[in-house]
Swiss-Prot record:
Gene for this chain: rbfA
Keywords on record: Cytoplasm, Ribosome biogenesis
SUPFAM superfamilies: Ribosome-binding factor A, RbfA
Primary location class: cytoplasm
Superkingdom in the source lineage: Bacteria
Family: Belongs to the RbfA family.
Assembly and interaction partners: Monomer. Binds 30S ribosomal subunits, but not 50S ribosomal subunits or 70S ribosomes.
Organism classification: Bacteria, Pseudomonadati, Pseudomonadota, Alphaproteobacteria, Hyphomicrobiales
Protein name listed in UniProt: Ribosome-binding factor A
NCBIfam families in the record: PRK00521.2-5, rbfA
Places the protein is found: Cytoplasm
Pfam families, A to Z: RBFA
Gene Ontology CC: cytosol
Length: 137
């Protein structure tokens, strides 16, 4: 019987994902990718999720200071093979070098939406004044 696909990532997947994230971050910080858009944009890599066979690495990135994230994501995906080659030296222990894919990280937007909902007057009214005082103590 095969493993369910929605199971939590293994310790190995998490460890390799963190190593790939650190390697990609170093490549971007050193300016090794020759693309004007990537060079002038500050890019934050929040997470790298590995496939179960460790052959695909999906990097969730947040371009800071840029309104159009899609163009930065597209530029990163255009240079994904080059980045894959550059991180190979840091990941020599891996049998296969993972294919790198870049996706927009929407988790910060989701956090802001949840925070705005929790601070909305409707939710504050439902909580009542007594519950707010208990949380502060």
């Amino acid at each position: 019987m095969s493993k369910p696909t929605n199971s939590a990532p293994s310790q190995r997947m998490l460890r390799v994902g963190e190593q790939v994230r650190a390697a990609i971050t170093q490549v971007l910080q050193r300016g090794e990718v020759r693309d004007d858009l990537i060079e002038k944009t500050v890019i934050s890599i929040s997470e790298v999720r590995m496939s179960t066979d460790l052959k695909v690495a999906t990097a969730y990135v947040s371009p800071l200071g840029v309104s159009d994230h899609d163009t930065v994501i597209a530029a990163l995906n255009r240079h994904a093979k080059y980045i894959r080659g550059r991180i190979g030296g840091q990941l020599r222990q891996m049998k296969y070098m993972p294919e790198v894919r870049f996706r927009d990280d929407t988790s910060f937007d989701n956090y802001q939406k949840i925070d705005a909902l929790l601070r909305s007057p409707e939710v504050a009214r439902d909580l009542g004044p007594d519950e707010d005082k208990q949380e502060d103590e």
